Regions:
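Acidic (Asp/Glu)-rich catalytic clusters
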Residues: 39-40, 73, 103-113, 137-144, ...
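Short, acidic/polar
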Residues: 60-71, 128-143, 191-195
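Conserved, mostly hydrophobic/aromatic
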Residues: 38, 50, 64, 79, ...
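Active-site mouth loops of central-metabolism enzymes
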Residues: 51-62, 120-130, 159
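Short Gly/Ser/Thr- and charged-rich N-terminal loops/segments
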Residues: 3-10
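N-terminal binding-site loop/beta-alpha segment at the start of enzyme catalytic domains
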Residues: 15-114
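Beta/alpha (TIM)-barrel catalytic core signal, keyed to glycine-rich beta->alpha loops juxtaposed to Asp/Glu
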Residues: 23-24, 156-346
Length: 346
């Protein structure tokens, strides 16, 4: 499932020690992500995107800032934020403190607002009392932003039609609150319905679908009906859960590793993830690379994918994940076929 764009390209040269610090050398050894079009929106995003789900409010602020700075220095321009309820028991807000912290870190990082593509979510959690405009205004206020570039709409609750969602996001675009919209975990028939509703209402088509996609979970992204629906909408995939919650980072291949899969298979889902993690680690060793970037490269090799979303708690994790860019550009046909076979029987 390769893409001709990904069959060429080499890592940049390494500068001399006398001109750059060791830290900068490490940055230069990582190939910067290219830009890919986000559907038909006219927005180009980096091949990897930095997420924030249950991250920044759980780590020290200087650690979060270091993560953002590393992403900026390595060429990531696509950031994903979301409102969710506090789980630490210490946040000053019951919901949305994640957005407050994100905004503070963003401003401290030195990024200019127009340098990044910023995504957030419409959860419809308080609909119908709170419509899309009210929900987004709350998020913008907490982040201290005037607009976001991309709003992902979660699957609607009972009573909220796709047609109504299309009209509401159309209003947000007209008001300058968002530049484009996408869908979050929508099934293929709902994506197809959205495309038809947009055509009828004269609203921009959804440009992206954020969907779980990994060596463990290839459906629905590779399903024929999803491919058809995305094609009709002219939408790209933003791949999420590509490391399967850490299962595909390679940590379970280490002796004495602890985590949700370290005890083997507590259920069928975890058993499959454990088997895939072992296969992936073996292939990574044969290819002389690491599990995490190889797992991300798998998603990047799908031409439907505009960007792979990942989260990091350390700058080194950002750098390690960016190695996927060069892998996707330089793996030969045999290696790609071996990668495609990882987990195929799980």
């Amino acid at each position: 499932m390769g893409d001709g764009r990904l069959c060429s390209g080499q890592a940049g040269g390494v500068p001399s020690q006398d001109r750059f610090s060791r830290s900068t050398l490490l940055f230069r050894e990582v190939t910067a992500p290219k830009r890919r079009p986000l559907g038909a929106s006219g927005i180009d995003v980096s091949e990897l995107s930095l997420g924030s789900w249950r991250t920044y409010e759980r780590i020290p602020r200087d650690a979060g800032l270091a993560v953002m700075n590393r992403a900026r220095e390595l060429g990531i321009n696509f950031l994903d934020d979301a409102r969710y309820n506090d789980e630490t028991g210490t946040a000053p807000l019951k919901t949305g403190y994640s957005e407050v912290v994100f905004g503070e870190l963003f401003r401290a990082s030195g990024w200019n607002r127009d340098e990044v593509v910023l995504a957030n979510k419409l959860w419809w959690e308080f609909w119908p009392e709170q419509d899309a405009a009210a929900e987004l205004d709350g998020s913008l206020g907490r982040m201290k932003m005037d607009y976001i570039d991309l709003a992902y709409a979660e699957q609607p609750p009972d009573g909220l039609t796709v047609e109504r969602i299309v009209l509401e996001v159309g209003g947000l675009i007209s008001a300058g609150k968002i530049r484009a919209w996408g869908v979050l975990n929508w099934p293929a028939p709902m994506i197809a319905e959205a495309a038809k509703s947009c055509a009828k209402a004269g609203v921009h088509l959804p440009c992206a679908a954020q969907l779980a996609y990994s060596l463990v979970k290839r459906s629905p992204v590779e399903d024929a009906d999803t491919v058809e629906a995305l094609g009709a909408a002219g939408a790209s995939v933003v791949s999420s859960f590509t490391l399967d919650g850490g299962a595909l980072t390679g940590k379970y291949a280490q002796p004495g590793a602890q985590g949700r899969l370290s005890g083997g298979a507590e259920d069928e889902r975890h058993a499959a993830a454990f088997r895939v993690s072992q296969e992936l680690a073996a292939l990574a060793q044969r290819l002389g690379t690491q599990s995490a970037p190889l797992a991300i490269a798998f998603a990047l090799l799908n031409p439907l994918v505009a960007s792979v979303l990942f989260g990091s708690t350390t700058p080194d994790q950002v750098s390690d994940n960016l190695k996927a860019v060069e892998l996707a550009a330089t793996l030969d046909a045999d290696a790609i076929e071996q990668l495609r076979r990882v987990g195929a029987e799980s």
